[in-house]
Protein backbone atom coordinates (compact mmCIF):
# COMPACT_ATOMS: atom_id res chain seq x y z
CA UNK A 1 0.00 0.00 0.00
CA UNK A 2 1.48 3.33 -1.06
CA UNK A 3 1.50 6.08 1.55
CA UNK A 4 0.32 8.69 -0.99
CA UNK A 5 -1.68 8.25 -4.17
CA UNK A 6 -2.73 11.09 -6.44
CA UNK A 7 -6.25 10.60 -7.77
CA UNK A 8 -6.34 13.61 -10.07
CA UNK A 9 -4.23 16.58 -10.99
CA UNK A 10 -5.80 19.78 -12.25
CA UNK A 11 -4.96 21.85 -15.31
CA UNK A 12 -2.21 23.42 -13.21
CA UNK A 13 -0.79 22.36 -9.82
CA UNK A 14 -3.78 21.54 -7.59
CA UNK A 15 -4.28 17.83 -6.97
CA UNK A 16 -6.58 15.45 -5.13
CA UNK A 17 -5.02 12.48 -3.40
CA UNK A 18 -5.23 9.94 -0.60
CA UNK A 19 -2.84 9.42 2.31
CA UNK A 20 -2.91 5.92 3.79
CA UNK A 21 -1.83 5.43 7.42
CA UNK A 22 -2.28 2.61 9.90
CA UNK A 23 -4.95 4.71 11.63
CA UNK A 24 -6.96 5.43 8.50
CA UNK A 25 -6.96 7.18 5.15
CA UNK A 26 -6.94 10.93 4.59
CA UNK A 27 -8.38 12.58 1.50
CA UNK A 28 -6.27 15.48 0.31
CA UNK A 29 -6.18 18.41 0.16
CA UNK A 30 -6.82 18.38 3.89
CA UNK A 31 -6.92 20.84 6.78
CA UNK A 32 -5.66 19.52 10.12
CA UNK A 33 -7.07 20.95 13.39
CA UNK A 34 -4.41 21.73 15.98
CA UNK A 35 -4.60 19.81 19.26
CA UNK A 36 -1.59 21.39 20.95
CA UNK A 37 -1.73 19.66 24.34
CA UNK A 38 -3.69 16.57 23.25
CA UNK A 39 -6.91 18.51 22.82
CA UNK A 40 -8.40 20.80 20.21
CA UNK A 41 -9.33 23.75 22.40
CA UNK A 42 -12.98 23.70 23.64
CA UNK A 43 -13.95 20.72 21.42
CA UNK A 44 -14.57 17.06 22.31
CA UNK A 45 -12.87 14.32 20.29
CA UNK A 46 -16.30 12.95 19.35
CA UNK A 47 -17.27 16.34 17.90
CA UNK A 48 -13.97 16.59 16.00
CA UNK A 49 -14.57 13.23 14.38
CA UNK A 50 -18.34 13.03 13.92
CA UNK A 51 -19.44 16.63 13.44
CA UNK A 52 -16.39 18.54 12.27
CA UNK A 53 -15.30 15.47 10.28
CA UNK A 54 -11.58 15.95 10.76
CA UNK A 55 -9.50 13.15 9.27
CA UNK A 56 -6.24 13.96 11.08
CA UNK A 57 -5.24 16.26 13.94
CA UNK A 58 -1.98 17.73 15.24
CA UNK A 59 -0.16 17.33 18.52
CA UNK A 60 2.68 19.52 19.77
CA UNK A 61 5.97 17.89 20.75
CA UNK A 62 7.21 20.75 22.94
CA UNK A 63 4.02 21.03 24.99
CA UNK A 64 3.44 17.27 25.34
CA UNK A 65 7.06 16.75 26.40
CA UNK A 66 6.66 19.27 29.22
CA UNK A 67 3.18 18.12 30.21
CA UNK A 68 2.06 15.37 30.75
CA UNK A 69 5.62 14.19 29.97
CA UNK A 70 6.91 11.12 28.20
CA UNK A 71 6.66 8.78 31.18
CA UNK A 72 2.90 9.27 31.24
CA UNK A 73 2.73 9.16 27.43
CA UNK A 74 4.51 5.80 27.20
CA UNK A 75 2.54 4.24 30.04
CA UNK A 76 -0.65 5.28 28.23
CA UNK A 77 0.59 3.57 25.08
CA UNK A 78 1.13 6.72 23.03
CA UNK A 79 -0.92 9.78 22.18
CA UNK A 80 -3.71 7.92 20.34
CA UNK A 81 -4.61 5.94 23.45
CA UNK A 82 -3.92 8.79 25.86
CA UNK A 83 -6.49 11.08 24.21
CA UNK A 84 -8.78 8.31 22.90
CA UNK A 85 -8.32 9.25 19.25
CA UNK A 86 -8.20 6.40 16.73
CA UNK A 87 -7.61 8.43 13.56
CA UNK A 88 -4.26 9.74 12.24
CA UNK A 89 -2.14 12.24 14.19
CA UNK A 90 0.73 14.47 13.05
CA UNK A 91 3.25 15.96 15.46
CA UNK A 92 5.55 18.90 14.86
CA UNK A 93 9.14 18.67 16.10
CA UNK A 94 8.97 21.34 18.80
CA UNK A 95 11.36 23.53 16.84
CA UNK A 96 8.94 26.38 16.19
CA UNK A 97 7.88 26.61 19.84
CA UNK A 98 11.45 26.41 21.16
CA UNK A 99 12.65 29.13 18.83
CA UNK A 100 9.69 31.28 19.81
CA UNK A 101 11.19 31.41 23.32
CA UNK A 102 13.74 33.94 22.09
CA UNK A 103 14.45 35.39 25.53
CA UNK A 104 15.00 32.07 27.29
CA UNK A 105 16.81 29.75 24.88
CA UNK A 106 20.36 29.22 23.68
CA UNK A 107 21.18 27.54 20.39
CA UNK A 108 24.28 25.59 19.38
CA UNK A 109 25.20 22.94 16.84
CA UNK A 110 24.13 20.34 19.38
CA UNK A 111 20.60 21.71 19.72
CA UNK A 112 18.62 24.24 21.73
CA UNK A 113 18.67 24.74 25.49
CA UNK A 114 15.47 26.37 26.69
CA UNK A 115 13.56 27.24 29.82
CA UNK A 116 10.12 25.71 30.39
CA UNK A 117 7.28 28.21 30.29
CA UNK A 118 5.57 26.10 32.97
CA UNK A 119 8.09 25.91 35.83
CA UNK A 120 11.27 27.59 34.60
CA UNK A 121 13.25 24.33 34.42
CA UNK A 122 15.92 23.98 31.73
CA UNK A 123 15.81 21.40 28.94
CA UNK A 124 17.83 20.53 25.84
CA UNK A 125 16.19 19.68 22.53
CA UNK A 126 18.51 18.08 19.98
CA UNK A 127 17.48 16.49 16.68
CA UNK A 128 17.85 13.11 18.35
CA UNK A 129 15.79 14.15 21.38
CA UNK A 130 12.99 15.49 19.18
CA UNK A 131 12.90 12.19 17.28
CA UNK A 132 12.88 10.21 20.54
CA UNK A 133 9.98 12.24 21.93
CA UNK A 134 8.00 11.84 18.70
CA UNK A 135 8.60 8.08 18.80
CA UNK A 136 7.21 8.06 22.34
CA UNK A 137 4.20 10.14 21.27
CA UNK A 138 3.65 7.75 18.35
CA UNK A 139 2.14 10.06 15.73
CA UNK A 140 1.45 8.66 12.27
CA UNK A 141 3.40 11.55 10.71
CA UNK A 142 6.28 13.28 12.50
CA UNK A 143 8.51 16.17 11.58
CA UNK A 144 12.24 16.83 11.40
CA UNK A 145 13.79 19.14 14.00
CA UNK A 146 14.42 22.47 12.29
CA UNK A 147 15.11 26.10 13.06
CA UNK A 148 12.42 28.59 12.10
CA UNK A 149 13.76 32.16 11.86
CA UNK A 150 11.67 35.24 12.45
CA UNK A 151 10.44 37.49 9.64
CA UNK A 152 12.14 39.58 8.49
CA UNK A 153 15.64 38.17 9.01
CA UNK A 154 19.02 39.02 7.53
CA UNK A 155 20.05 36.94 4.51
CA UNK A 156 23.22 35.58 6.12
CA UNK A 157 21.35 34.69 9.30
CA UNK A 158 18.73 32.80 7.28
CA UNK A 159 21.45 31.01 5.28
CA UNK A 160 23.26 29.84 8.42
CA UNK A 161 19.97 28.74 9.97
CA UNK A 162 18.97 26.80 6.86
CA UNK A 163 22.33 25.03 6.73
CA UNK A 164 21.95 24.10 10.40
CA UNK A 165 18.48 22.70 9.65
CA UNK A 166 20.00 20.56 6.87
CA UNK A 167 22.72 19.21 9.19
CA UNK A 168 20.11 18.48 11.83
CA UNK A 169 18.04 16.63 9.21
CA UNK A 170 20.88 14.14 8.69
CA UNK A 171 20.97 13.50 12.44
CA UNK A 172 17.19 12.99 12.50
CA UNK A 173 17.39 10.48 9.65
CA UNK A 174 20.27 8.59 11.29
CA UNK A 175 18.44 8.35 14.63
CA UNK A 176 15.23 7.15 12.99
CA UNK A 177 17.12 4.43 11.11
CA UNK A 178 18.45 3.02 14.38
CA UNK A 179 15.29 3.31 16.48
CA UNK A 180 12.11 1.52 15.37
CA UNK A 181 8.52 2.47 16.17
CA UNK A 182 7.23 1.67 19.66
CA UNK A 183 3.53 0.96 19.26
CA UNK A 184 3.19 -1.36 16.28
CA UNK A 185 2.10 1.20 13.69
CA UNK A 186 4.11 2.89 10.96
CA UNK A 187 5.38 6.44 11.48
CA UNK A 188 6.07 8.59 8.40
CA UNK A 189 8.84 11.20 8.53
CA UNK A 190 8.65 14.65 6.88
CA UNK A 191 11.67 17.00 6.58
CA UNK A 192 11.06 20.75 6.35
CA UNK A 193 12.09 23.29 3.71
CA UNK A 194 13.38 26.57 5.19
CA UNK A 195 14.93 29.74 3.74
CA UNK A 196 12.52 32.54 4.72
CA UNK A 197 11.52 34.67 1.69
CA UNK A 198 14.85 34.32 -0.15
CA UNK A 199 14.20 32.45 -3.38
CA UNK A 200 17.75 31.15 -3.84
CA UNK A 201 17.85 29.75 -0.30
CA UNK A 202 14.42 28.17 -0.68
CA UNK A 203 15.60 26.52 -3.89
CA UNK A 204 18.68 25.09 -2.17
CA UNK A 205 16.63 23.86 0.78
CA UNK A 206 13.90 22.34 -1.42
CA UNK A 207 16.56 20.41 -3.34
CA UNK A 208 18.24 19.13 -0.16
CA UNK A 209 14.90 18.09 1.33
CA UNK A 210 13.86 16.39 -1.93
CA UNK A 211 17.10 14.39 -2.00
CA UNK A 212 16.44 13.12 1.53
CA UNK A 213 13.91 10.71 0.02
CA UNK A 214 11.37 11.01 2.83
CA UNK A 215 7.74 9.90 2.45
CA UNK A 216 6.47 13.46 2.51
CA UNK A 217 7.84 16.99 2.67
CA UNK A 218 6.90 20.15 4.54
CA UNK A 219 7.36 23.86 3.93
CA UNK A 220 8.09 25.78 7.12
CA UNK A 221 8.98 29.33 8.04
CA UNK A 222 6.00 30.91 6.30
CA UNK A 223 2.86 32.55 7.66
CA UNK A 224 5.12 34.24 10.24
CA UNK A 225 4.33 37.83 9.28
CA UNK A 226 5.35 38.06 5.64
CA UNK A 227 2.91 39.60 3.11
CA UNK A 228 0.46 37.21 1.45
CA UNK A 229 2.17 37.76 -1.90
CA UNK A 230 5.44 36.45 -0.45
CA UNK A 231 3.70 33.42 1.05
CA UNK A 232 2.26 32.52 -2.35
CA UNK A 233 5.46 33.28 -4.28
CA UNK A 234 7.66 31.09 -2.09
CA UNK A 235 5.09 28.29 -1.96
CA UNK A 236 4.87 28.31 -5.75
CA UNK A 237 8.65 28.21 -6.15
CA UNK A 238 9.11 25.39 -3.63
CA UNK A 239 6.32 23.16 -4.97
CA UNK A 240 7.96 23.43 -8.40
CA UNK A 241 10.96 21.61 -6.90
CA UNK A 242 9.51 19.15 -4.38
CA UNK A 243 8.71 15.65 -5.72
CA UNK A 244 5.28 15.49 -7.32
CA UNK A 245 4.59 11.99 -5.99
CA UNK A 246 5.03 12.96 -2.32
CA UNK A 247 2.56 14.87 -0.13
CA UNK A 248 3.38 18.53 0.51
CA UNK A 249 2.54 20.07 3.88
CA UNK A 250 2.42 23.86 4.27
CA UNK A 251 2.85 24.52 7.98
CA UNK A 252 0.78 27.09 9.88
CA UNK A 253 -1.49 28.31 7.06
CA UNK A 254 -3.91 30.02 7.42
CA UNK A 255 -7.04 31.97 6.43
CA UNK A 256 -9.66 30.30 4.22
CA UNK A 257 -8.37 32.24 1.21
CA UNK A 258 -4.75 31.34 2.06
CA UNK A 259 -5.80 27.70 2.07
CA UNK A 260 -7.48 27.83 -1.34
CA UNK A 261 -4.61 29.74 -2.92
CA UNK A 262 -2.12 27.26 -1.43
CA UNK A 263 -4.10 24.30 -2.77
CA UNK A 264 -3.89 25.98 -6.16
CA UNK A 265 -0.10 26.03 -5.78
CA UNK A 266 0.13 22.28 -5.19
CA UNK A 267 -0.21 22.00 -1.40
CA UNK A 268 -1.88 18.87 0.02
CA UNK A 269 -1.88 19.44 3.80
CA UNK A 270 -2.31 22.51 6.01
CA UNK A 271 -2.78 23.32 9.69
CA UNK A 272 -3.42 26.47 11.66
CA UNK A 273 -4.71 27.60 15.06
CA UNK A 274 -6.67 30.37 13.35
CA UNK A 275 -10.12 28.71 13.22
CA UNK A 276 -10.15 28.02 16.96
CA UNK A 277 -8.20 31.09 18.11
CA UNK A 278 -10.35 33.45 16.08
CA UNK A 279 -13.48 31.59 17.18
CA UNK A 280 -12.63 32.27 20.81
CA UNK A 281 -12.49 35.96 19.85
CA UNK A 282 -15.94 35.87 18.20
CA UNK A 283 -14.73 35.73 14.58
CA UNK A 284 -16.58 33.22 12.40
CA UNK A 285 -15.59 32.22 8.87
CA UNK A 286 -18.43 31.38 6.47
CA UNK A 287 -19.05 30.89 2.75
CA UNK A 288 -20.52 34.42 2.72
CA UNK A 289 -17.60 36.09 4.50
CA UNK A 290 -16.27 36.84 7.97
CA UNK A 291 -18.63 37.56 10.90
CA UNK A 292 -17.79 39.34 14.15
CA UNK A 293 -20.36 37.86 16.50
CA UNK A 294 -20.07 40.73 19.00
CA UNK A 295 -21.42 43.22 16.46
CA UNK A 296 -24.68 44.97 17.32
CA UNK A 297 -26.15 43.96 13.95
CA UNK A 298 -26.66 40.38 15.18
CA UNK A 299 -28.50 41.39 18.36
CA UNK A 300 -31.99 40.65 16.97
CA UNK A 301 -31.03 38.33 14.13
CA UNK A 302 -32.81 35.09 14.99
CA UNK A 303 -31.82 33.28 11.79
CA UNK A 304 -29.56 30.20 12.04
CA UNK A 305 -25.93 30.89 12.87
CA UNK A 306 -24.95 29.76 9.35
CA UNK A 307 -27.59 28.41 6.99
CA UNK A 308 -24.87 26.88 4.79
CA UNK A 309 -22.91 25.40 7.70
CA UNK A 310 -22.33 21.66 8.06
CA UNK A 311 -22.23 21.38 11.87
CA UNK A 312 -25.12 21.00 14.29
CA UNK A 313 -24.35 24.36 15.95
CA UNK A 314 -25.05 26.18 12.69
CA UNK A 315 -28.69 25.11 12.69
CA UNK A 316 -29.48 24.73 16.41
CA UNK A 317 -28.43 28.23 17.48
CA UNK A 318 -29.27 31.68 16.16
CA UNK A 319 -26.91 34.57 15.49
CA UNK A 320 -28.65 36.55 18.23
CA UNK A 321 -28.13 33.77 20.76
CA UNK A 322 -24.45 33.29 19.94
CA UNK A 323 -23.89 37.06 20.12
CA UNK A 324 -25.59 37.08 23.52
CA UNK A 325 -23.24 34.32 24.73
CA UNK A 326 -20.15 36.25 23.61
CA UNK A 327 -21.32 39.53 25.11
CA UNK A 328 -22.11 37.66 28.34
CA UNK A 329 -18.66 36.02 28.27
CA UNK A 330 -20.16 32.53 28.42
CA UNK A 331 -17.80 29.60 27.74
CA UNK A 332 -20.38 28.03 25.45
CA UNK A 333 -19.83 30.86 22.96
CA UNK A 334 -16.23 29.77 22.38
CA UNK A 335 -17.26 26.14 21.99
CA UNK A 336 -20.01 26.89 19.46
CA UNK A 337 -17.74 29.19 17.45
CA UNK A 338 -14.85 26.71 17.47
CA UNK A 339 -17.04 23.86 16.23
CA UNK A 340 -18.45 26.11 13.51
CA UNK A 341 -15.07 27.36 12.28
CA UNK A 342 -13.42 23.95 12.24
CA UNK A 343 -16.39 22.40 10.43
CA UNK A 344 -16.23 25.23 7.90
CA UNK A 345 -12.51 24.68 7.28
CA UNK A 346 -13.07 20.96 6.73
CA UNK A 347 -15.99 21.71 4.42
CA UNK A 348 -13.81 24.22 2.54
CA UNK A 349 -11.14 21.66 1.65
CA UNK A 350 -13.78 19.01 0.92
CA UNK A 351 -15.47 21.28 -1.63
CA UNK A 352 -12.08 22.29 -3.04
CA UNK A 353 -11.31 18.61 -3.57
CA UNK A 354 -14.62 18.11 -5.36
CA UNK A 355 -13.78 20.95 -7.76
CA UNK A 356 -10.31 19.51 -8.43
CA UNK A 357 -11.96 16.20 -9.33
CA UNK A 358 -14.52 18.04 -11.47
CA UNK A 359 -11.77 19.92 -13.31
CA UNK A 360 -12.92 23.48 -12.53
CA UNK A 361 -10.98 24.25 -9.35
CA UNK A 362 -9.28 27.46 -10.51
CA UNK A 363 -12.43 29.07 -11.89
CA UNK A 364 -14.26 28.17 -8.68
CA UNK A 365 -11.43 29.43 -6.45
CA UNK A 366 -11.22 32.78 -8.22
CA UNK A 367 -14.96 33.29 -7.81
CA UNK A 368 -15.17 32.29 -4.15
CA UNK A 369 -12.05 33.91 -2.64
CA UNK A 370 -13.35 37.52 -2.84
CA UNK A 371 -16.56 36.41 -1.11
CA UNK A 372 -14.71 34.61 1.67
CA UNK A 373 -12.65 37.74 2.41
CA UNK A 374 -15.55 40.16 2.81
CA UNK A 375 -16.67 41.35 6.25
CA UNK A 376 -20.33 40.83 7.03
Question: Residue locations for each model-derived region?
Answer:
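Conserved, mostly hydrophobic/aromatic
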Residues: 24, 57, 92, 134, ...
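C-terminal extensions of enzymes
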Residues: 1-18, 26-33, 41-42, 146-152, ...
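Non-catalytic, usually N-terminal nucleic-acid engagement modules in DNA/RNA processing proteins
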Residues: 1-182, 296-299
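Glycine-rich phosphate/ribose-binding loops and adjacent secondary-structure elements
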Residues: 175, 179, 188-305
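Short, electropositive alpha-helical surface patch
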Residues: 156-166, 199-212, 333, 339
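Post-transcriptional modification and biogenesis factors for structured RNAs
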Residues: 185, 296, 313
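Short, well-ordered coil/turn segments that N-cap beta-strands
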Residues: 53-55, 85-89, 138-141, 184-189, ...
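Flexible, glycine/charged-enriched surface loops at secondary-structure junctions
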Residues: 178-185, 358-363
Amino acid sequence: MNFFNIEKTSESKARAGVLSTDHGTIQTPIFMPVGTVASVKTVHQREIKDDIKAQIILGNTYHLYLRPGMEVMQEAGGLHKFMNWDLPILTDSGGFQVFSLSGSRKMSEEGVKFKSHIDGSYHLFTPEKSMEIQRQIGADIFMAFDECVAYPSDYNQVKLSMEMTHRWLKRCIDWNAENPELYGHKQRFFPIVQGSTYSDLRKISAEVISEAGAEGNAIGGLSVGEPEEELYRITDEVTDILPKDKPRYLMGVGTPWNILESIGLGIDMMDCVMPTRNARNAMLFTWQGVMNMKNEKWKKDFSPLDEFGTSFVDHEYSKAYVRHLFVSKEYLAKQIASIHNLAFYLDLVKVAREHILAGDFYQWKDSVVPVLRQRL
